[in-house]
Design a protein with these regions (language model features):
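Charged, low-complexity cytosolic intrinsically disordered regulatory segments
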Residues: 43-110, 115-121, 128-129, 149-171
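General small-molecule cofactor/ligand-binding pocket signal
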Residues: 36-38, 86-90, 137-145
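Intrinsically disordered or low-complexity boundary/linker segments at protein termini
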Residues: 1-17, 129-171
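Short, structurally constrained coil/turn elements
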Residues: 29, 79-81, 133
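Glycine-rich, flexible loop segments associated with nucleotide phosphate handling
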Residues: 35, 125-126
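Small/aliphatic-rich secondary-structure junction motif
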Residues: 2-53, 165-171
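Hydrophobic/aromatic ligand-binding patch that stacks against planar heteroaromatic rings
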Residues: 25-27, 101, 131
């Protein structure tokens, strides 16, 4: 049976540092990993909007090319230990809903950033970190330095920097 790891995301390459850390921490295990990247967004209360609600369409709007490319790179680099990597939206309103989400997805551990504030994409988005910190799931806080980007060349380098370790390319 695969271990399931829950990781909050804001659909930036930077937020994938949590996934990279989780994968590195579990790289010596023979157990396969299920990675769930989750984003907090409330659903509308409009009957019309709920009738035509599509999680796929919402994710399509939230994801960008750099994020998709970085996810593919993570999958390729850690294919030997990743059983499945998915992106989901949590739209619950309280801690009980979050605990039910964890139980329903059989989440065994979670990773959150210590010194990085997730960026909310729209007015319906909300910060999931308080739900994580109050949960009963084993929680790992990841500390990393963020770098401000000044131009698009730096943004491209940010993707490749996910896979550099101490000045050398990680294999």
């Amino acid at each position: 049976m695969a271990k399931t790891i829950l990781i909050p995301t804001d659909f930036t390459v930077e937020s994938l540092n949590l996934a990279k850390t989780a994968l590195e921490n579990n790289s010596n295990t023979t157990e396969k990993l299920r990675i769930i990247l989750v984003y907090g967004q409330w659903t509308s209360s409009s009957i019309t909007e709920l009738l035509f609600y599509s999680k796929g369409q919402i994710l399509e709007v939230l994801e960008n090319e750099e994020f998709k490319c970085s996810c593919k790179m993570l999958l390729a680099k850690y294919e030997s230990i990743i059983d499945q990597m998915s992106i989901d939206i949590f739209s619950g309103t309280n801690q009980n809903a979050f605990e039910n989400y964890l139980e329903g997805n059989k989440v065994t551990e979670a990773y959150i950033p210590r010194n990085y504030k997730l960026k909310l994409k729209n007015r319906n988005s909300f910060n999931l970190i308080p739900f994580f910190t109050k949960s009963k799931t084993q929680l790992f806080e990841v500390n990393w330095n963020t770098v401000s980007l000044e131009n698009s060349e730096n943004q491209k380098n940010e993707i490749s920097s996910l896979f550099f370790t101490h000045g050398q390319i990680a294999h």
